[in-house]
Regions:
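Conserved lysine of the Walker
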Residues: 36
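Nucleotide-state sensing region of NTPase/ATPase domains
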Residues: 48-142, 148-154, 158, 220, ...
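Conserved NTPase motor "head" modules and their coupling/switch loops across ABC/AAA+ ATPases, GTPases
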Residues: 1-31, 45, 78, 185-203, ...
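Structural motif
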Residues: 108-109, 280, 366
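Structural recognition of the conserved hydrophobic beta-strand(s) that form the central parallel beta-sheet
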Residues: 72, 344-351
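Walker B catalytic acidic pair
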Residues: 322-324
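A conserved P-loop NTPase coupling/switch region
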Residues: 117-122, 129-199, 203
């Protein structure tokens, strides 16, 4: 996958900017707070996903404006010897709540705009920013989101199944919730409804967990090999999926814990309570990993995510690396730069001196104004 060009209007602190990336490496330099990450974030939105920094869509729009607009030309990879793929044009609008069309909408090649989530899978990308260090030290929810976000890009049906699971889970929790302000359903009726919801949860949960397990068979070996290179073999990384049930066992688990859930007033089991355990020398990284080890673990996962996506889809995702090189020693930096070869990669940096001799493109961002160096 390649981004051929990008035009940004009224996006965060960027009034107007045009980017014409290099075929492989594109570097965006500038001091902190100038808008480098904003530009990477704009590229990421072309995946159809939400901002990797969190927050509401309205926060993406430049202060005083109703809309932000992103226009991009993209091109899919083709096997060597084949005719190049036709470029696709994406136009995305991000509207504030006061705008005529609030939220994120995208149109491809002039078609009618759809919700931006419909872009899932059409522009594969992998992003790393310092906030992703929470993958190691943070709550299990962040590690589940990491898996689910990757799978939503790779398999169009995964997003639909995941949304169904979440919707049924919300209905189940609403049914289970105790409230002093509303009349409770008769116990027998509540139990019957719970069995219906559990049947649907089991069907969706089994399918989602199977995809997660299959994906990890590709991701885990690559991530662990990457870590061995980054750490020079100092520690051994391993990954374990902490499942609540074995394949085919979710329906039984839900039946076994039904009475307990009725008493607790909430759902107590399912794929939304599973975790991805990251280990260094068989010890939990969330407890023992240093800051440098955390960074190496997350980088290993992200590079493995890109490699797994390339194997599954047949094309390399675009890499978006925010402030990733600043804290790496020369050996780790060179390994990472080697991994970037033959992949379109966007890197932000506060220091442009080490990139001025690159074969790629170098831009500088100052106060939301982008200029080629």
């Amino acid at each position: 996958m390649r981004l051929l060009s990008l035009e940004v209007q009224n996006y965060r602190n960027i009034c107007a900017a045009r980017l014409e990336p290099g075929r492989e490496l594109t570097v965006i330099c500038g001091n902190n707070g100038q808008g480098k990450t904003n530009l990477l974030e704009a590229i990421w939105l072309l995946t159809g996903g939400k901002s990797f920094r969190g927050g509401k869509d309205a926060e993406l729009v430049r202060r005083g404006e109703a809309f932000a607009v992103l226009e991009a030309d993209t091109q899919r990879d083709r096997p060597e010897g084949c005719e190049p793929a036709e470029p696709a044009h994406i136009r995305m609008t991000v509207g504030t709540p006061e705008a005529a069309k609030p939220g994120r909408y995208a149109a491809v090649n002039g078609a009618a705009p759809k919700r931006a989530a419909a872009l899932a899978g059409s522009f594969p990308a992998v992003v790393f920013d310092p906030g992703h260090l929470s993958l190691v030290k943070g709550a299990p929810e962040g590690r589940r989101k990491f898996l689910d976000a990757a799978l939503c890009q790779l398999y169009p049906g995964y997003l639909a199944s995941y949304r169904r699971y979440v919707r049924v889970l919300q209905q189940k929790n609403a049914l289970l919730r105790h409230s002093a302000t509303r009349q409770e359903r008769p116990y027998a009726e509540k139990r019957t409804l719970l069995e219906v919801l559990n049947t649907e949860l089991a069907a969706q949960g089994e399918a989602l967990q199977q995809r997660r397990r299959e994906y990890l068979t590709l991701l885990a070996p690559r991530a662990c090999a990457n870590y061995a290179e980054l750490s020079h073999g100092a520690e051994r990384m391993s990954i374990r999926y902490a499942a609540q049930f074995t394949p085919g066992g979710l329906a039984d688990l839900l039946r076994q814990r039904q009475e307990e859930e009725l008493r607790a007033g909430q759902s107590l089991c399912g794929i939304h309570r599973e975790d991805l355990e990251l280990l260094l020398d068989d010890q939990p990284a969330r407890v023992y990993a240093s800051q440098g080890q955390q960074r190496s673990v997350v980088l290993s996962l992200k590079m493995a995510e890109a490699a797994a996506a390339a194997q599954i889809t047949g094309e390399h995702p675009v890499l978006l690396l925010d402030d990733v090189l600043s804290e790496l020693d020369e050996g780790r930096k060179q390994y990472l730069l080697t991994c970037m070869k033959e992949k379109q990669t966007f890197v932000t940096s506060c220091d442009d001196t080490e990139f001025l001799k690159t074969d790629g493109e170098v831009y500088r961002m100052d106060g939301g104004v982008l200029n080629r160096v």
